[in-house]
From Swiss-Prot:
Keywords: Cell membrane, Lipoprotein, Membrane, Palmitate, Signal. This is Uncharacterized lipoprotein YgdR. Transmembrane segments: none annotated. It holds the Pfam family DUF903. It is found in: Cell membrane. One of its GO terms (cellular component) is plasma membrane. NCBIfam families: lipo_YgdI_YgdR. Its main location: membrane. The lineage of its organism: Bacteria, Pseudomonadati, Pseudomonadota, Gammaproteobacteria, Enterobacterales. Residues 1-19 form the signal peptide.
Length: 72
């Protein structure tokens, strides 16, 4: 019985953790749509938006070039 409780808890935890990371779409002023893995972070000091692309590469874009950020 305890074995089933552990398995059910592990599966529930896996679903809870996987639901926390959403993908976002950034629309740029020149018409590009950038898909991100997780929420982009805006640095007010530098004016850059940091994000990870769909392949997992760390990228940055100037905040002035982004028109909107939408959760997917």
């Amino acid at each position: 019985m305890k074995k089933w409780a552990v398995i059910i808890s592990a599966v529930g935890l896996a679903f809870a953790v996987s639901g926390c990371s959403s993908d976002y779409v950034m629309a740029t002023k020149d018409g590009r749509m950038i898909l991100t893995d997780g929420k982009p972070e805006i640095d007010d000091d530098t004016g850059l938006v940091s994000y990870h692309d769909q392949q997992g590469n760390a990228m940055q874009i100037n905040r002035d070039d982004v028109s909107q950020i939408i959760e997917r």
